Every structure is written in structure tokens, then in C-alpha cells.
Amino acid sequence: NGIEQPLFQGREWVTACRKWKEKYPVVLPRHWQEDGLHANAYAFVDYLSTQLPPRTLTVVSNGTCCVAGHQAYVIKEGTRFFNSNAVASMGYGLPAAIGGCVANKRRTTVCLEGDGSIMMNLQELQTIITNALPIKIFLINNEGYHSIRQTQNNLFADHCKVGIGPESGDLSFPDFSKLARVFGYPYFAAHSNKEMQ
């Protein structure tokens, strides 16, 4: 009759997904290996999400935050996870976190932002401070526009390094610890998986 039967019926699908999740974990032991220089984004998102209480609102911006967030974030009961997946708009995180926090009666909100993305709406830090919004920002600093960096490395190898960060010689970012202090935002840094924990 041309109608295909589904591979799984009812709860079989959930059971199959759980088995695959165990067999093919997103966060692997290599993500936790220490290099002493950088915290791994997948390990970070996994660790952070397991430490957050149930019912946490989490907003992820674009790039690494979005990719690692979608794959490694552990969803708990009542958790809300907001993203801009379809267009991955730079600068989405801060205003979306503000909107999510206010719309949910000032519920504690976590915002995962990238160093490039936060620069698009940096002024919103003052909105958060002025309104005493309970928003915790976790900045993934990969020293530039990492998604663009990956595209250039994958497609053009060493022939093209433009507008991606220090290695292109035409783009730099501010000292985020100083920026946080200027806005009156507490700042803590973790440069390795060990420091992160």
C-alpha cells in the first residue's frame, strides 16, 4: 500500500534512543584530557549543566555555544533551553537571556555566549546590572570568530586567514575581565578543565 511502518513503536523509540546515548556519548574521555591551556567546550557544557538546579533557564548564543550546547547540555526536569538554531545569529545570547529572564518572572537564567557574539550586544550588560536581573553569563572565549575560522581552515587551509582572530593579524578582542569590571559584573576565569571544576 506504499505506507511504510515506523522502525519503532511507542516506548521502543525512547528505549532505542537511551541505548544509543549510552553507546555513543557526546562527551568523550578525550574532552576531559587536560592540556592546561583551555577548558574543552563540550566538557564545560556537560559539567555546567549537571551542576545547575532543575528548572534552570539556559540561553545559548551561536557558534561553539550553540554546537556544544545542543550536544552536551544535560536537560533536567523543568529546564528551558533557548537557542537561535535556524539562523545562529551572532549577538542572540544576551538579549534572549534578558527576555527569557523577564518573561519568566526574573527566574535565574544562564547565558552561554561567545567572545565574538557578546561584542554585538555588549551594552546589554548594563541593562542586566541596572535591572538587577539574575543572569549568569558564561563566556566561551576561543579568541575570535571560531566558526569562520573553521570554515577558512577547512576550505582554504593556509591561503586565507581574514577577520578570525589574532592569527589573522587583523582582529583582536578586549580584555573581558576589565570589561566586566567596568559594567560592575563579577568575573571569574577558567582556562583549563581543572580550573573549570
Across the structure, where does each feature detected by a protein language model lie?
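Active-site diphosphate/adenylate-binding microenvironment
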Residues: 16-95, 100
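Flexible, glycine/charged-enriched surface loops at secondary-structure junctions
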Residues: 4-20
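Generic low-complexity, intrinsically disordered sequence content enriched
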Residues: 11-12, 32, 183
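Thiamine diphosphate
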Residues: 1-7, 68, 73-197
